Amino acid sequence: MRIYIVEDDLSVINILEDIIEAQGLGEICGDCGGEPANLADVLRSKPDVVLVDFFMPVKDGVEFVKELRTVNTTIKCIMISQV
């Protein structure tokens, strides 16, 4: 399973990547590097699943998923938050 991480906090990205790799849950095919999510980058990575931070400063997770759904309805999205 190919996993892309959309998260604005680099420490959370690193933790998620460590857990996913240690547990053998899938292959990390990319992350947004703590920057605002770029839909084109996500699509280019061809993920099966996108982990999406619910609260992000530029575009929140719900907005991102709505945008993703306009061009791809097969990628699974899992909303995450560190609240």
Summary of predicted features, one role per range:
Residues 9-30:
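Two-component/phosphorelay signaling modules centered on CheY-like receiver
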Residues 31-49:
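Acidic, metal-coordinating helix/loop segments flanking the phosphotransfer/catalytic sites
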Residues 34, 60-63:
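Acidic catalytic/metal-coordinating carboxylates
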Residues 62-74:
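Short amphipathic alpha-helix used as the core "switch/output" element in two-component signaling
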Residues 53:
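Active-site residues of response regulator receiver
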Residues 46-48, 72-76:
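His-Asp phosphorelay/catalytic-motif detector in bacterial-type signaling
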Residues 56:
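Receiver (REC) domain active-site loop signature in two-component systems and cognate sites
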